[in-house]
């Protein structure tokens, strides 16, 4: 049997001095633990008492750390779990208990987190459902919770609206720098990279009602022709050079008819 000989408050914890224990002469406990066990100077403790106190204290400190961590912004249960593990709360059962208590008190709510995250992305107009899902998965949220939240919040109409605005932005950026075909391909690719399906991306693209700017297309073709011709003239000539240039321009999205027309009037560099 041992006892407490002194209790001193430190910056964050209390130092509890002990006597009568072979392996412990002092321990550091949270205020929650001090209050929970009514600890005071001269209180007698046996080995079982000490083990129970230390076990509870790790839980109490874990809860305190978790409350501190979530005080700045919403966190997922997975983020809280990782944070506790990184801060020397190594008992998984106690971490589970902390998570369960905070969840029961609605201080951790993965469903609400997913819903707020999705609504934020929709408001920002920055991502499609697939990209949102992948980001939430990295935060440790159950895919079933994510799918349900997306289904409830991010319907097809909202997806088309966000995709259309992103398509408009791409058009403003690249409209005069690309051919119509290149521009359409660019818009579709950008939208799919943002997490929209091909179907939604195509609807957004069609809604733009893009039209060919003949003057701009011609200028782009001749600019590209100059660059490609200069490159291939270093190693090729005659028919082979013409074929290489034609293929290169076709890969850039120019039609064979337009390429042939341009080449008829073009003089290759010597």
From Swiss-Prot:
One GO cellular component term noted in the UniProt record for this chain: cytoplasm
Subcellular location: Cytoplasm
GO process terms (BP): regulation of DNA repair
Keywords associated with the record: Cytoplasm
A Pfam family per the record: RecX_HTH2
Role, per record: Modulates RecA activity.
Similarity-based family: Belongs to the RecX family.
Annotated NCBIfam families: PRK14135.1
Name assigned to this protein: Regulatory protein RecX
Organism: Lactococcus lactis subsp. lactis (strain IL1403)
């Amino acid at each position: 049997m041992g006892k407490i000989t002194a209790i001193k408050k430190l910056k964050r914890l209390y130092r509890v001095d002990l006597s009568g224990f072979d392996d412990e002469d002092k321990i550091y406990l949270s205020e929650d633990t001090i209050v929970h066990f009514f600890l005071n100077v001269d209180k007698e403790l046996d080995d079982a008492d000490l083990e129970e106190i230390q076990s509870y204290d790790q839980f109490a400190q874990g809860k305190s750390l978790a409350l501190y961590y979530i005080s700045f912004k919403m966190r997922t249960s997975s983020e809280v779990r990782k944070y506790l593990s990184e801060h020397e709360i190594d008992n998984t059962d106690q971490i589970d208990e902390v998570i369960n208590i905070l969840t029961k008190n609605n201080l951790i709510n993965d469903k609400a987190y997913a819903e707020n995250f999705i609504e934020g992305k929709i408001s920002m107009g920055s991502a499609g459902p697939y990209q949102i899902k992948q980001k939430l998965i990295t935060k440790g949220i159950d895919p079933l919770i994510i799918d349900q939240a997306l289904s409830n919040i991010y319907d097809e109409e909202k997806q088309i609206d966000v995709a259309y605005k992103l398509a408009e932005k791409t058009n403003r950026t690249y409209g005069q720098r690309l051919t119509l075909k290149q521009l359409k391909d660019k818009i579709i690719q950008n939208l799919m990279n943002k997490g929209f399906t091909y179907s939604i991306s195509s609807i957004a693209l069609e809604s733009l009602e893009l039209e060919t700017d003949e003057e701009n297309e011609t200028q782009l073709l001749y600019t590209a022709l100059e660059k490609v011709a200069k490159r291939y003239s270093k190693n090729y000539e005659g028919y082979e050079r013409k074929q290489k240039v034609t293929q290169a321009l076709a890969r850039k999205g120019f039609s064979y008819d337009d390429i042939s027309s341009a080449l008829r009037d073009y003089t290759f560099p010597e």
